[in-house]
Curated annotation (Swiss-Prot):
The record marks 148 as: Important for catalytic activity for the proton relay mechanism but does not participate directly in the coordination of zinc atom. This is L-threonine 3-dehydrogenase. Belongs to the zinc-containing alcohol dehydrogenase family. It comes from Streptomyces coelicolor (strain ATCC BAA-471 / A3(2) / M145). It is an enzyme of class 1 (oxidoreductase). Binds 2 Zn(2+) ions per subunit. Pfam families: ADH_N, ADH_zinc_N. Zn(2+) 2 binds at residues 93, 96, 99, 107. Zn(2+) 1 binds at residues 38, 63-64.
Length: 342
């Protein structure tokens, strides 16, 4: 089968022929229809410092996908050939305290699809049945392909109650954009999102942000004044991983404010912990999705009319992956989709 492979320990990806995956008794074989390009895939392609430490070549990359089940292991009873599915990209041990308690997203032995094992940028992918989400109601294929990052957005945005709250989101990348859409849909009063890309800020306006603020020429305090906020933001969603974004967020929270932090910093940085303590701010780290509560919430949000169409800005055949990756790496748009049927 054709697959996008990190063949060598150097920058680049290769469209190559590799063997089709085999399945065990509890696994599912899936024909891939479409995939989404993630920031993780960009790091692997660029072969940056993180990738050099985390990746062992050769590796089929990719973890965001939608496909159709073509075969199941003998012990799989609730998934059948023909089902339209997406997959949870974090594979867990099933044996640790957190897994046994049902907190699978907290497993210390998590292995990432397309990072620690062959992934989904291929004509076929195999997963344990426990990692397969069946779309029981129709979902647009492009949206179904990005259920993984959509789950990151939902997990982060719904970490705290949002109804009537003023929400600050730092970082208007694809996950930040989806979080803005979720926050508005879930009843937030104001949703302010910051970035330095006007193209992405325009996408934020399309998904319903109350105010899309370019912090290269305005401050979050300016945004507060424009909206008439006098006490700061109730909820903060940090999506950028930028030190200055986290510091600005803390400085603009109300007393008792709550911050969910998904953005992954590249290195340690100082934080005004005195402000966190004296303002009684809660900071919660987010990694991945809650399995499968977040997936259920995603489906319900879409059934309820949540529109993610503006977030998807690029569509390419998998054969045009070089152009697709360049688009995704530009930092100007939203999610980029690879079509494995074209």
């Amino acid at each position: 089968m054709k697959a996008l492979v990190k063949e060598n320990a150097e920058p680049g990806l290769w469209l190559a022929d590799v063997p089709e995956p085999t399945i065990g008794s509890g696994d599912v074989l899936i024909k891939v229809l479409r995939t989404g390009i993630c920031g993780t895939d960009l790091h692997i392609r660029a072969w940056d410092g993180w990738a050099q430490q985390a990746i062992r070549t050769p590796l089929v990359v990719g973890h965001e996908f939608v496909g159709e089940v073509v075969d199941t292991g003998r012990d799989v009873t609730d998934i059948k050939a023909g089902d339209r599915v997406s997959g949870e990209g974090h594979l867990v041990c099933g044996k640790c305290r957190n897994c046994l308690a049902g907190r699978r997203h907290l497993c210390r032995a998590t292995v990432g699809l397309g990072v620690g094992r062959d992934g989904a940028f291929a004509e076929y992918v195999a997963l344990p049945a426990s990692n397969v989400w069946v779309h029981r109601v129709p979902v647009d294929l492009d949206v179904a392909a990005i259920f993984d990052p959509f789950g990151n957005a939902v997990h982060t945005a719904l970490s705290f109650p949002l109804v009537g709250e003023d929400v600050l989101i730092t970082g208007a990348g694809p996950i930040g954009l989806m979080a803005a859409a979720v926050a508005r849909h879930a009843g937030a009063r104001n949703v302010v999102i910051t970035d330095v890309s006007e193209e992405r800020l325009e996408l934020a306006r399309k998904v319903g942000a109350t105010l899309a603020l370019n912090v290269s020429d305005a401050t979050i305090a300016d945004g507060q004044r424009e909206l008439g906020l006098r006490e700061g933001f109730d909820i903060g969603l940090e999506m950028s991983g930028r030190p200055e974004a986290m510091r600005d967020m803390i400085a603009n929270m109300t007393h008792g404010g709550r911050i969910a932090m998904l953005g992954l910093p590249a290195e340690e940085f100082p934080v005004d912990w005195a402000r966190v303590v004296t303002s009684m701010i809660t900071v919660k780290g987010i990694y991945g999705r809650e399995m499968f509560e977040t997936w259920y919430a995603m489906s319900v949000l879409l059934e309820g009319g949540l529109d993610l169409a503006p977030v998807i800005t690029g569509r390419y055949s998998h054969r045009d992956f070089e152009a697709a990756f360049a688009d995704a790496a530009s930092g100007r748009g939203g999610k980029v989709i690879l079509d494995w049927t074209a």
